[in-house]
């Protein structure tokens, strides 16, 4: 089982820990309470940018959980549009419903949160 916890930007890995405009989530594997991933994102009014996602062994389910956590965080703060700019997890982002729009993966948060998961259920 995994747990995703919002963190202050200072708790993110460098160089993200130096950018006060960022928000973040850290994922933990509850079997041994070890850190298994993190993501960084920025809220920009009604839109957000997911700029960094990292998971141990590039685990798709962990990446999905981090992306969904970030989307939920933004959605709860009146953000409507999400742009996925991270280098990792692009395949997972596409499964969730992000679509290429002028070279940037984009989607509206309500639709993205309804997207297919990595297990295809």
Give residue ranges: language-model regions.
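Conserved donor-binding loop and adjoining core beta-sheet/short helix segment
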Residues: 25-61, 65
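C-terminal "cap" of GNAT-fold acetyltransferases
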Residues: 102-121
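Short amphipathic alpha-helix that is part of the acyltransferase structural core
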Residues: 1-28, 116-121
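Short, exposed beta-strand/loop patches in secreted or surface proteins that constitute
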Residues: 40-43, 82, 97-98
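Conserved GNAT acetyl-CoA-binding A-motif
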Residues: 74-87
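A conserved short alpha-helix in the GNAT/GCN5 acetyltransferase fold that borders
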Residues: 67-75
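Conserved active-site alpha-helix within GNAT-family acetyltransferase domains
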Residues: 87-103
């Amino acid at each position: 089982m995994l747990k995703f916890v919002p963190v202050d930007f200072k708790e993110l890995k460098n160089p993200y820990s130096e950018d006060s405009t960022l928000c973040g989530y850290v994922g933990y594997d509850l079997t041994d309470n070890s850190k298994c991933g993190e993501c960084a994102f920025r809220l920009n009014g009604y839109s957000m940018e997911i700029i960094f996602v990292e998971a141990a062994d590039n685990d798709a389910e962990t990446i999905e959980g981090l992306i969904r956590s970030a989307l939920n965080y933004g959605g709860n703060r009146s953000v409507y549009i999400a742009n996925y700019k991270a280098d990792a997890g692009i395949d997972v982002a596409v499964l969730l419903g992000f679509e290429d729009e002028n070279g940037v993966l984009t989607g509206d948060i309500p639709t993205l949160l309804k997207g297919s998961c990595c297990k295809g259920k």
